[in-house]
Structures are given as C-alpha cells and as structure tokens.
C-alpha cells in the first residue's frame, strides 16, 4: 500500500506533474457479453427499447451493439466475434480468464470510457497508466483510445479508458436517442479518496458516485420498464 492508499500495480503511477484539471466527459459505458445477439435481445426486452446496430472491430476480434442514452453518452454491448481472430490481445480485458468466467455467468459492466480533448496530455497527467494510445477506425469513424498491451483495465475498470474523437464525432451523433437514461455511475473502492483525486484530476464528472467497499462498478439506468443497476464485482 502506498501513501495514496491504493495497492500498487502496473496500472497506477505517482503523480509526475502539478495538479492540472482537464476537460472531459463520459463518452460511453461498456457492457461485456459472451454472446452479442442473445444478450442484446435480453436487454432490449428488459429495457423495453431496441438497440441500434454497431459494427465489427477486426483488429480486436470483437463486435458490438449500441444504445444512445442522453446527449453524447451511449451504452455499448461488446462481445468476442466468433467469426474473427484478433490481431492483438483484445481490449477491455476480454481475453482475461476472470473476465471470461464473469461473462459466462451473464452480461456485466467491463469499464467506462472518458472522452478527452488531448489524449496524449491526459494520458501523461492522469496519475495512472491507462495504456498506450492506439488509432482505431470503422467506416468513416476514427478515434484514438488507450489500451494496455495486455488488454487489461486500470483498477479492473474502475479507472476510465481514455478516448479522443479527432473529427469531433462519436457514435452518439448518429444513434437514435432512446428513453433510457444514465442516472449515475457508481464506483466502489477500498480507498475512495484516491479514486476521487484521480477523477478530479480528469475533470468534473457529476454523474459519478464513489463509495467505500470492495471494488465494484455499477451502471444505474432509468428505462421505460423501470430502474436497473448493472453491477460487476471486481
């Protein structure tokens, strides 16, 4: 345990520069599924709304379906594509045996993705190691995203993946606005003050609640069929 109260691992760093508040916003929430089709259909039934089509990520060997929540935030359901071999370790810890076991038991939150203006500066100053910045594209969409070489997630997904859309467009621009709303994202951690300090460094994020306890990530959603709390214990 270091002075910040966080157990050291390869994803966390000491702050290397004076505190600098960055501009950021939640970009999207990531739900992992073992089978994309059947588990998206189950969510559509639970929520009472259809998901939009997503696409494939050939480099990662994954595919997804999307749902616009509000403003510029969307929900992504992602799964390994059984017809595609990845060209590298899959992102969002999807090749990790623990993640595979969790997804075998049903759909679970994997992580959340934070949109930043300057991804290289944010990566340098965020106070943890979100991974290397890689370029991705699908159709006319292009983006930069942080992915560790081992495909892992910082603090198991509690700390955000960073993303930048160079063209200023993210999928929410063309998705159908749904009645499903993110009320808040709940983070539970043994040292909540340490997580809060890092997130404050990344910018004001009013949709995030941080509580003390065993590591967990929970998406709280309001839908036409009621409120849902989608939770992963990490």
Residue ranges and their predicted role:
Residues 57-60:
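A short beta-turn/loop motif at secondary-structure boundaries
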